[in-house]
Amino acid sequence: MDPSRHTHVMLVSFPGQGHVNPLLRLGKLIASKGLLVTFVTTEKPWGKKMRQANKIQDGVLKPVGLGFIRFEFFSDGFADDDEKRFDFDAFRPHLEAVGKQEIKNLVKRYNKEPVTCLINNAFVPWVCDVAEELHIPSAVLWVQSCACLTAYYYYHHRLVKFPTKTEPDISVEIPCLPLLKHDEIPSFLHPSSPYTAFGDIILDQLKRFENHKSFYLFIDTFRELEKDIMDHMSQLCPQAIISPVGPLFKMAQTLSSDVKGDISEPASDCMEWLDSREPSSVVYISFGTIANLKQEQMEEIAHGVLSSGLSVLWVVRPPMEGTFVEPHVLPRELEEKGKIVEWCPQERVLAHPAIACFLSHCGWNSTMEALTAGVPVVCFPQWGDQVTDAVYLADVFKTGVRLGRGAAEEMIVSREVVAEKLLEATVGEKAVELRENARRWKAEAEAAVADGGSSDMNFKEFVDKLVTKHVTREDNGEH
């Protein structure tokens, strides 16, 4: 089959695991419907690791369902040893300057397979500028909750009061959201945050989405989970197509494909180890790819797990390349009680019957995976949207218990409290309630991605519109 006859979609991702994975899942789904997808991110550090972990060859078409996907990696322009790559304030404008030209060059290189749509995630908002300049429809994948999107929207338009330097402790009242205390709003919006640059880039994406009238705004959620908030946002932004298409990882599970976005090879024996455990006997612990806890806090969590009597599967990442963080050391007796790995297939782990609960940083990817697996969460957020996600898990979805309030709290949670919260999530009436609620959300998520479900129909509508645009352009002789 001639790939040049396929509708061609180019996806551009910020180089980070939590950004790459959802966008790649979307890309695989698009390809599976008979389209051609080119997935683009930077060569270092993530592209290089993706290539190694997945045996990816640049530009080579890989079949996915009825279509194809390929990968392109471009240089970010930094020398190998340039530490500015790991300084977001320096990296952001540099990536924009280099990336705009690289994406233009890629689009022109594939002129015999004209790009019908450009899709990006929120940390590379400048892709919308490229799309507008080249007169290509664009779409954005939002990889946080619709609740967080609403918070950013209200902050950007100054529709309600948010914490300020003079009033840092005020709560925030947003329609369709629970009352958020000052440390429960997305932390990048708080004036005390050391990471306000992350909030700025997200706000840049919001501005571009409104100004450029992007083709679609995808959200990795499902309608049944955030119905009222989505209806409210659709009323606020009638010109936008706000389209929930999640859980993306669940949608992508229906595909037979070896294309993955992992930066590391998962531990090969962790699933076999789980097979040897009793049902609901293991706490799974992972704090994502970015968050770094203090050694003292890691030790308190370790001793809390030991006191709880649960077995543990714990993902402890080595320090990221270019960062100056000491590797964590865990008590030897914990290793005898459980299994410590650098990486694991989280979706499969959470679905395993041995998992009793998930001690999580509450990033949105992990939140969606826990809800879809029907697993209770012990919430230990650090920053960004994680603190808001923790509110929803504990108070709205009612599948979680709160262990901490975020890095801004600047306190070490004791081993006694860790053990108490682990037991609360796994033993007794509260644990039964959490598990029942989690199973209910699991069923709702499965219904959303099933044939004819809300997310499935939203996705099919998008693909149909893209294909129609492509056919119309061909009929008009456009290239």
From Swiss-Prot:
Catalytic activity, EC: 2.4.1.120, 2.4.1.177
Class in the EC hierarchy, top level: transferase
Binding, an anthocyanidin: H19, G384
Keyword line: Glycosyltransferase, Transferase
Organism superkingdom: Eukaryota
Residues the record lists as binding UDP-alpha-D-glucose: Q346, H361, W364, N365, S366, E369, D385, Q386
Active site, UniProt feature: H19
GO MF: cinnamate beta-D-glucosyltransferase activity; hydroxycinnamate 4-beta-glucosyltransferase activity; sinapate 1-glucosyltransferase activity
Catalysis: reaction(s): (E)-4-coumarate + UDP-alpha-D-glucose = 4-O-(beta-D-glucosyl)-trans-4-coumarate + UDP + H(+); (E)-ferulate + UDP-alpha-D-glucose = 1-O-[(E)-feruloyl]-beta-D-glucose + UDP; (E)-caffeate + UDP-alpha-D-glucose = 1-O-[(E)-caffeoyl]-beta-D-glucose + UDP; (E)-sinapate + UDP-alpha-D-glucose = 1-O-(trans-sinapoyl)-beta-D-glucose + UDP
Alphabetical list of Pfam families matching this protein: UDPGT
Xref: PANTHER family: GLUCOSYL/GLUCURONOSYL TRANSFERASES, UDP-GLYCOSYLTRANSFERASE 84A3-RELATED
Function recorded in the entry: UDP-glucosyltransferase that forms glucose esters with phenylpropanoids. Glucosylates 4-coumarate, ferulate, caffeate, sinapate and cinnamate.
Family to which the UniProt record says this protein belongs: Belongs to the UDP-glycosyltransferase family.
Protein name: UDP-glycosyltransferase 84A3
Gene this protein is translated from: UGT84A3
